[in-house]
């Protein structure tokens, strides 16, 4: 299978990098500090959601802003302690792309996303974070904004995601979707193509755009 595109849009956590251990470590500490019970915390989905949404599910509205700032500090500080690592295939795939043909689209704040990306040497020309949008994934706004930043028709963009909410955002934006089974089982992911991770793919830049193929 070969997919043709003009731009590639990547989620970050679970797609380009792994930060799951850091997320669990920092949020568990945060929950203890804010008196969130283990039962309440266990019932909340963390992956693929903004901190504002998560905290809003757990604390009164008047405590959200301060609590979000606290968990952001915890997560940013954890980056220096090895809280992020590249996932297989990330470096080779990004190195094969022109800088103006790809973007990172994440539910993290700009400060946290920049820290994680910088830690592994990824410096996208276009970066869309929770701070740049009013509605996060699964709403299409983040991916539509990335397409505008790159000057590419959404219909010619391909979204790479590991989370159902992100894949839903890509579909709603009218984009082709590629799911990576890094944090969810393949059968849980609704996408045009499902692969294990980015190492399963190869890209070739042509005069007409970018060709994405499954290796082997």
Predicted regions: what is each one?
Residues 18, 104-106, 179:
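Hydrophobic residues in well-ordered beta-strands that form the structural core
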Residues 79-84, 105, 135, 172-173:
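Short, flexible loop segments at the rims of nucleotide/cofactor-binding pockets, characterized by
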């Amino acid at each position: 299978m070969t997919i043709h595109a003009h731009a590639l849009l990547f989620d970050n956590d679970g797609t380009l990098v792994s930060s799951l251990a850091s997320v669990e470590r920092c949020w568990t500490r945060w929950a203890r500090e804010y008196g969130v019970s283990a039962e309440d915390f266990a019932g909340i989905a963390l992956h693929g959601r903004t901190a504002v949404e998560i905290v809003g599910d757990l604390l009164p509205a008047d405590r959200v802003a301060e609590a979000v700032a606290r968990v952001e500090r915890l997560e940013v500080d954890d980056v220096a302690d090895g809280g992020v690592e590249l996932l297989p295939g990330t470096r080779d795939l990004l190195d094969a792309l022109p800088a103006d043909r790809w973007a990172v689209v994440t539910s993290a704040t700009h400060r946290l996303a920049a820290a994680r990306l910088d830690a592994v040497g990824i410096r996208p020309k276009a970066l869309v974070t929770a701070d740049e949008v009013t509605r996060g994934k699964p709403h299409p706004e983040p991916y539509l904004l990335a397409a505008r930043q790159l000057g590419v028709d959404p219909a010619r963009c391909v979204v790479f995601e590991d989370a159902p909410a992100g894949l839903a955002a890509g579909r709603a934006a009218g984009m082709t979707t590629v799911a990576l089974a890094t944090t969810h089982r393949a059968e849980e992911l609704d996408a045009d193509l499902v692969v294990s991770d980015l190492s399963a793919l190869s890209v070739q830049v042509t005069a007409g755009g970018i060709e994405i193929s499954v290796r082997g």
